[in-house]
């Protein structure tokens, strides 16, 4: 039950953070799910196409660009596109002076995903070594997820939808404990 309360508090904190006005990235403590505003220099030449499904389960790419903000390098996840939009100039139209987004810590690479094909710019994970090999730069552990009403690429919606199975776990363990207690009482009564 303690972990359930901890998880509910964590979800509440994330929801609260996502509804607050954005803060200046340079003048704030970096933390997960922080809404930020910033400006920087986007590198369209080293754009990364990360294979992913959209909200409807359709395959495509998330467009990720290196962005330099006051000498610090970040990855900017601009959103999802269909396969046919890859390398289209139409997707390189972001105003570099008014970026609003959400900071999120980079997930660890899944060992079951295929290797990135850096030469064809076809990515399955944002493996830090591969990203360095491709861009020649080291990046913050936080990714900026673009926020806004853009059509192409369509920004990924970041919300507090994190796994919370603690109620199920508690119910399972309490049910198991009660079952064992009832079996114990049944056999104890039978033997006396």
Where are these regions (language model features)?
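Surface-exposed, charge/polar-rich loops and edge strands
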Residues: 2-27, 34-192
């Amino acid at each position: 039950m303690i972990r359930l309360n901890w998880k509910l508090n964590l979800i509440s904190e994330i929801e609260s953070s996502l509804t607050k006005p954005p803060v200046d990235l340079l003048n704030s403590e970096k933390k997960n799910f922080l809404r930020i505003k910033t400006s920087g220099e986007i590198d369209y030449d080293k754009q990364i196409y990360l294979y992913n499904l959209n909200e409807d389960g359709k395959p495509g790419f998330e467009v990720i660009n290196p962005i330099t903000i006051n000498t610090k390098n970040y990855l900017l996840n601009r959103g999802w596109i269909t396969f046919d939009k890859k390398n289209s100039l139409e997707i390189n139209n972001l105003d570099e002076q008014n970026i609003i987004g959400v900071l999120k810590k980079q997930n660890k690479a899944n060992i079951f995903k295929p290797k990135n094909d850096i030469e064809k710019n076809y990515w399955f994970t944002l493996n830090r070594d591969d990203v360095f090999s491709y861009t020649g730069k080291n990046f913050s552990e936080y990714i900026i997820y673009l926020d806004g009403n853009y059509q192409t690429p369509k920004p990924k919606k970041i919300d507090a939808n994190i796994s919370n199975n603690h109620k199920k776990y508690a119910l399972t363990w309490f049910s198991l404990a009660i079952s064992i207690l009832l079996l114990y009482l049944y056999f104890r009564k039978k033997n006396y």
